[in-house]
Amino acid sequence: MDVTRLLLATLLVFLCFFTAYSHPPPEEKLRDDRSLRSNSSVNLLDFPSVSIVALNKKSKQISRKEAEKKRSSKKEASMKKVARPRTPLSAPCVATRDSCKPPAPACCDPCASCQCRFFRSACSCRVLSLNC
């Protein structure tokens, strides 16, 4: 009885595989040469033409200056961020990279959080965001 079930299961899997891969999606169906030629010529005409423009030195310098301004403004914006006030440390807390298995108290660093791996068998406090 087990052999017949095994054979039937194998046959069922083979039939499912065969039916799934024997029918290609509509865009992959084979076509005759005439339709391929007509489609390829139409596709080439559908796309807009590409124009190549040479940049002179002045435009290159302007773009460099604009890029430097953007970089400096981003640096200034990141430096202007106000540091959020840190909560006072509670006496029982776990240091960064130490074990913080669930009955343990919270992490000492306010930017750190307890991350568990391997089905909560190995947990440690880790700092996730560098901007904190």
Curated annotation (Swiss-Prot):
Disulfide bonds join C93-C108, C100-C114, C107-C125, C111-C132, C116-C123. PROSITE patterns: AGOUTI_1, AGOUTI_2. One of its GO terms (biological process) is hormone-mediated signaling pathway. Its main location: secreted. GO terms for molecular function: melanocortin receptor binding; neuropeptide hormone activity. It comes from the Eukaryota. Residues 62-88 are annotated as: Disordered. Residues 1-22 form the signal peptide. Residues 63-79 have a biased composition (Basic and acidic residues). Involved in the regulation of melanogenesis. The binding of ASP to MC1R precludes alpha-MSH initiated signaling and thus blocks production of cAMP, leading to a down-regulation of eumelanogenesis (brown/black pigment) and thus increasing synthesis of pheomelanin (yellow/red pigment). This is Agouti-signaling protein. It comes from Macaca arctoides. The gene is ASIP.
